[in-house]
Design a protein with these regions (language model features):
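Bacterial N-terminal signal peptides
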Residues: 8-18
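Short, flexible, surface-exposed loop segments at domain boundaries
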Residues: 19-82, 87-420
Length: 420
């Protein structure tokens, strides 16, 4: 990914989200099926990733509320079809996120409660007082538009962490820090005490260091406290059990831009390889039916991908298109997605100059096939593979056999177990 492309992507997301948290309405918002929801309607919360079902793009988060964090039960979430995951300030998949990572969330009510892949909660669930746990820990807005880790959140919003003081004992201890705007701010930022230990990774340029390395260099004390004088860094934040009711842990410290950009590049390459093997997700806007199975399909590619993936969609390029669930799991095909996918070619690629909502790439692709399949209908989700992308065999859990191709059977049933 080119540096300019990265800055453009981060800036674009930042502009589209500017002030969204502040102006979000109190009333819960339910997206309309087939439409990209306005970001300013999203409910904002934060918590620790506890469970992941990557094949179905869902999981659970322990939401940070007003009370004792460690007692909060994990809450289910599902990514919207066009929902974006970002890790280390780059596009990602749920499988890329380590358990325990503290994530920032933008979510809505389920678009259609009848087909939700996670439990549907009362719309006012986040307002319920849970005693010692406090309020805000059970949001009904569990269908997510954006899920991002700490450095992704800070880089998108133009923020940094400033380290004030470190206190070390036996290669572990605490850091006092505050999250602040890079441009400076008039109000004093709240300071937070975060833990760190011998496993905390410290990135300096291309180097990977540990706490003991900074101690050996005399940068941090072997024991006791030292002022860090507001050193600007980016932090990776997790949670681990300790004696405090609510205290978070530092998994990574990026000391400079070179270190952070190296992490961005690495995650971007992981993302590109993943999408090329699983195909680009898109929404069907229109289908023009011809005779004997011929059809022309207009789709909108989902947003949040690396720019280089979109450039692979070119006029007259051969392509495959397959139906998908809202979980982005391929449907049909006993032997994998390519088995029953519609084959054809790209007629045109149309890019809009207008502002588009988050989750929308602003790119339409017109695709012509001589044998359209059932899953390609207006409003449905599909996945598209241009001919230049690799032909791979997906693992069994990432596509549905025809038996499971109806909504009532999208979850595994006893059929998956052998008969003895």
């Amino acid at each position: 990914m080119k540096h300019g492309s990265l800055i453009g992507l981060v800036s674009g997301i930042a502009v589209s989200m500017l002030g969204s948290a502040a102006i979000a309405e109190d009333a819960p918002f339910r997206p309309e099926p087939g439409k990209f929801p306005p970001l300013e309607k999203a409910h904002v919360y934060r918590g620790e990733l506890v469970f992941v079902d990557h094949a179905n793009r869902r999981g659970s988060i322990r939401v940070q509320g007003e009370g004792t964090y460690f007692r909060n039960p994990p809450q289910p979430f599902a990514m919207l079809p066009y929902g974006m995951v970002r890790y280390h300030a780059a596009p990602a998949d749920l499988r890329d996120l380590p358990l325990g990572t503290v994530l920032h969330v933008r979510g809505y009510l389920p678009p259609d409660p009848k087909t939700s892949v996670v439990p549907v909660l009362p719309v006012n669930a986040k307002d319920k007082d849970h005693g010692y746990l406090g309020k805000g820990i059970t949001p009904a807005e569990n269908h997510l538009l954006l899920l991002e880790d700490e450095p992704s959140h800070c880089l998108r919003e133009g923020k940094i962490w400033k380290l004030k003081e470190v206190n070390i004992t036996n290669n572990a201890g605490t850091i006092v820090a505050s999250r602040e705007s890079k441009q400076g701010q008039t109000e004093k930022a709240d300071e937070e005490t975060l833990t760190l230990d011998g496993a905390t990774c410290i990135w300096r340029g291309r180097e990977s260091l540990l706490v003991e390395d900074l101690i050996a260099e005399g940068i941090w004390p072997n024991s006791g406290k030292k002022s860090l004088e507001g050193q600007a860094v980016q932090l990776g934040i997790t949670w681990k059990p300790n004696a405090e009711f609510t205290q978070f842990h530092i998994s990574d410290i990026w000391l400079d831009d070179t270190a952070m950009q190296f992490a961005v590049r690495k995650q971007t390459e992981t993302h590109k390889a993943f999408i090329r093997s699983r195909w680009m997700p898109a929404r069907v806007d229109a289908v023009e039916y011809g005779k004997f199975g011929h059809a022309t399909v207009t789709t909108t590619l989902f947003g949040g991908m690396d720019d280089s993936l979109y450039t692979d969609f070119k006029k007259n390029v051969p392509a495959l298109m397959n139906g998908a669930e809202n979980t982005l799991k391929h449907t049909a095909g006993v032997h994998g997605p390519a088995h029953m996918a519609s084959r054809g070619s790209i007629l045109d690629v149309i890019k809009t100059d207008e502002d588009v909502p988050l989750g929308n790439s602003g790119i339409q692709v017109r695709f012509k096939t001589d044998l359209i399949i059932e899953g390609i209908r207006p409003g449905r989700v599909v996945r598209v593979r241009p001919d230049s992308w690799p032909k791979v065999k997906l693992p069994r859990e990432e596509y549905l056999e025809p038996l499971f191709g109806i909504p009532q059977k999208r979850f595994p049933t006893p059929y998956i177990f052998p008969k003895y």
